[in-house]
Each structure stands twice: as structure tokens, then as C-alpha cells.
A protein has these predicted regions:
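Glycine-rich phosphate-binding loop of ATP-dependent small-molecule kinases
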Residues: 1-215
């Protein structure tokens, strides 16, 4: 089974994909994770992507499609795939068709996580992680039990992603509406699109996605 999770950055795509990996043995192909790995390794692609990502822009179709193609080639044909954060444009949607067709795969479901923009801004700008172990926290929803001390490892240093700010979030929302939303008619014409309330409790979102995949 091959599925796409759609929604603006911060809608919870990564969380839901991780649960599908754990519960269904699928493989998550997250362009965000793959690009951040390239940025950390300071590869030529990573350096180019870094400036674009931190300004809230979207990296080129050529870069992203190349990363996805290589990832698919590394998997067995029977392995189910979750596309997290891809495709983001009509051009990428058509590229994905070509990538799947060339490997004998078909796209089974497209699930959109719908969100409220103001609530999403609060969700994203408030998040931070332990610098030592990576445990995630939030200013409003999940603060450390002891202020300034990580619950998991006891670390006292925390960090926020450079692009977790309101201006960048709203820029990405505008780009999502302008560039990503228009790809939905492509998949709606195939009858494979479902929508889930991305602002609901994570467990409720997971249950809704499971119901879609099992029907």
C-alpha cells in the first residue's frame, strides 16, 4: 500500500506517519527528514536547501524528486510507503506518478490533515526540544515537569528550530494553499482522497486514518 499524507507543515503528518510505521510496518519517506539530514551533512544539496528552508520557501522539484526516487529504489516492491510532505506541487504529483509507475507501484490513498491556521501557528511556534536527547516539548501543551529540566534525560539546554516562527509558518501556509492544495483535484478525480481533522487529538486522528486504510 502506498499513501500520501497532505497538510501544511506542523499539521501532524510526521507523527501519524510514525504510527503507521510502527503499527503497519510501512516505511515513511519524509522529505523534511531527508532534507534535514542533507543539511546536517552539509552536502551540496543540503547547503542549497538550508537557505531555502529557513526562509520558508520550498526546495526545487528536481532536488526533492531525486531524493524520493533513490529512496524507493532502496525498498523491496512489497514494502508499503507513506509519503510525508510530498508531493507539494502539481509538478511533483506528476513526477510521483512517473516514479511509482516505473517501479510497478500504485497510489492507494491520499489523506489530507485539515488545520486552522491560527491554531497551527500556536502549535508550531511553541514547540522546542531537549538539545541533548531530542525529547519534544511545547510552551502551552507539554512543558517539562521541572522547569528547565528535560523529563527524559535531565538535560538543561533546549533548542527551537530556526524556521519555527510565525512569519515562516504563515508563509508556508500561503504556499501550501497556493501550490499544494491545487494537487487535490488530481487525486479527487481518482476517488482516493479523504480528509481528517488534523487539529483533533492525535489518537483520534490515528483512528480516523486507520478506518480509511481498512475500509
Amino acid at each position: 500500500m502506498n499513501i500520501i499524507l497532505l497538510g501544511p507543515p506542523g499539521a501532524g503528518k510526521g507523527t501519524q506517519a510514525s504510527r503507521l510505521v510502527e503499527n503497519r510496518g510501512m516505511v515513511q519517506l519524509s522529505t523534511g527528514d531527508m532534507l534535514r539530514a542533507a543539511v546536517k551533512a552539509e552536502t551540496p544539496v543540503g547547503l542549497k536547501a538550508k537557505a531555502i528552508m529557513e526562509s520558508g520557501g520550498l526546495v526545487s522539484d528536481e532536488i526533492v524528486s531525486g531524493i524520493i526516487g533513490e529512496a524507493l529504489d532502496a525498498l523491496s516492491p512489497e514494502t508499503g510507503v507513506i509519503f510525508d510532505g510530498y508531493p507539494r506541487t502539481q509538478a511533483q504529483a506528476h513526477s510521483l506518478d512517473d516514479l511509482l509507475d516505473a517501479r510497478g507501484r500504485t497510489l492507494d490513498h491520499v489523506i489530507e490533515l485539515a488545520v486552522d491556521e491560527d491554531a497551527l501557528v500556536e502549535r508550531i511556534t511553541g514547540r522546542f526540544t531537549c538539545a541533548a536527547c531530542g525529547e519534544g516539548y511545547h510552551d502551552s501543551f507539554k512543558r517539562p515537569k521541572a522547569d528547565g529540566v528535560c523529563d527524559k534525560c535531565g538535560g538543561t539546554e533546549f533548542k527551537r528550530r530556526a524556521d519555527d516562527n510565525e512569519e515562516t509558518v504563515r508563509t508556508r501556509m500561503a504556499e501550501y494553499r497556493a501550490k499544494t492544495a491545487p494537487i487535490l483535484p488530481i487525486y479527487e478525480a481518482r476517488g482516493i482522497v479523504s480528509r481528517v481533522d488534523g487539529m483533533a487529538d492525535m489518537d483520534d486522528v490515528s483512528a480516523a486514518i486507520a478506518a480509511i486504510l481498512d475500509r
